[in-house]
Amino acid sequence: MKRILDTVHGYIYIDDDLMSSFVDTLYFQRLRRIEQTSARAVFPSARHDRFIYSLGVYAIGRRIVDSIKANKDDFGYKEAVHEPFFKSYLIACLMHDCAHTPFSHTFEGYFKGSEEELAILLKNELEDSESFEIDRFDDNKEEFKIAPHEYLSAILCLKKYKKEVVQYGAIPDLVARMIVGIQYKQNHSFENCLISLIHGDVIDADRLDYVCRDRWASGYSTSTIDVARLIASIHIIKKDGEQYRVCYDSSAIHDIEGVLAVKEFQQKFVINHHTICYEQFLLKKAMEHTANCLINEDCSSENEETATLALKSLCNPPVMWDGLHAYGFDIDYLSDDDFVNMMKRFMDNTYVNQWFSRNYAMKPLWKSKADFYSLFSSKKNDPLDEYNSVYRKSDPYNLEREFRGELKVEDFLRLNAEEKVSCISNNMFILTKNGSFQSHESLFGHQESKSSVLFFYLYLSSDAMRYKDRIIKYLNA
C-alpha cells in the first residue's frame, strides 16, 4: 500500500498494484502537465493539475466503496459477485481523465463533430459493443451527451491498460461505461448505482473532489461541505425484489445542497468570470494561429475556418494514445507544455502576445450580471425581453453599422458565458429514520431539472471605449 499526502484529503492510500500498473506509467504521469482549470488568470494560486485531481477522485471513490461495504446487509454483499464491480469503480475513478487534452476543457470543442468517430473507436475496444450501442441512446433515440475527454479516456484505458484492468480483478467494459457515464438499460442495476457515483447528476466522486480542490487551490470563500459526513450517508439498497438504488441518509440533505451551492458559485464567479472568458478566447485564437502557421505554413491568412481546421488536426483523437507524428512533429504524451512551446514561436501575433503578457487589448463593457442589469434593466420591459434586445443589438456587425466610419467590427467582441444550473434530482432517494426510502420529490416536491442560463459579455477595444456612453445608450434604446 502506497501513501500519498494530499492537501485536500490528507493521506491517500493506493494499492501497490494500482500504483505500478496505472499511476507510475507514462500516460498517467502526463497528467502532471495538464492544468486542472482555467482559473489562474484570476486566481493565481489555482496551480493544480489533473494528476492530483485524479488521485483525489480515487480517494473519494475508495471512501465511498468503504461506506457502501460498511452496510453490506443493505444489498446482500457477496465477495465473488460485488468485488469486481467495486474494483472497476476504483479504476474508473483513477483513470476517468487519463486522456484529457492539453489545457483541460479549453480545446475540447475542437473534438466536436467527431463524437460518432469516438463512439466507433470505443466500440472497437469493447467486448460487448452491441449493448453499449443500444444503451448510449435514450428512449427517444437521442444520444446521451458524452464529452470528448470521456470518450478519449475510456478508449485510452482499454487500449493501453486492458490487461492491467483484468489482472486487478476488474471488468474492462464496465470501467469504460463508468468513465463515459452510460448506464445499462436492462439488468445490472447494481453496476448502474456505481456508474452514478462517478458520473451522477449531483453527487459523485468526481464532483466531490473538484468542488473541494478548486476552492482550496483558488482561495475563494463559499459554502463548506462536510465530505466525510456526506460519504458516510451513502447506501446501495435493494428491497422486495426491486432494483438496487443509491440512497442517502436524510441527515445529508444539507451537505448535498452545499455541493450544489459551491458548484453554482464556481459557475457564476469563476468559470464565467469576464477575465477567464476572455483569456480562454485568447488561448483558443492563439493556438488556432499557431496551428495554421505550423500546418499550413500560412501565418498571414486571417481565414478563421482554415485556422480552426488546422487546430482540429492537432486535436485529432488518436494523438492522445499514438502521439503526434505528422506535420513535422514528433511528440508523444501531448501536454500543456507542448502547446506553450508551439505558441512561443509566434510571439508577434496579437492573440499569442496577449495570452502570454496578460496585457489585454479589449475590456468588458460590464463585468457581471449585476453590472449588466444596472445598465439595461427597465421597469417597463420584461427582463428576458430586455436581455434579448441587448443581445441582438450587441452583435459586432450591428455595432459596426451603428458606428459606421467611426468603429470597425474588430473593435467589438461578444462572448457567451453559459451557466449550467443543477438541482437535486427528483429521482434521488432519501433513507428516512424509519428505514424506508423515498424519492426527494415525494418528500420535498418537484424540482426544476438541470438547465442552462445564458449570459454574455461585450468587450471593447481602446478605441471603442471612447464611445462607451454612446454604445450603452444605443443598447438601451
Task: Give names to the regions the model predicted.
Residues M1-I91, A99-M362:
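Sequence-structural signature of the catalytic-core scaffold of metal-dependent phosphohydrolases
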Residues V270, T275, K284, L294-A477:
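Terminal helices and disordered tails flanking the catalytic cores of nucleotide-processing hydrolases
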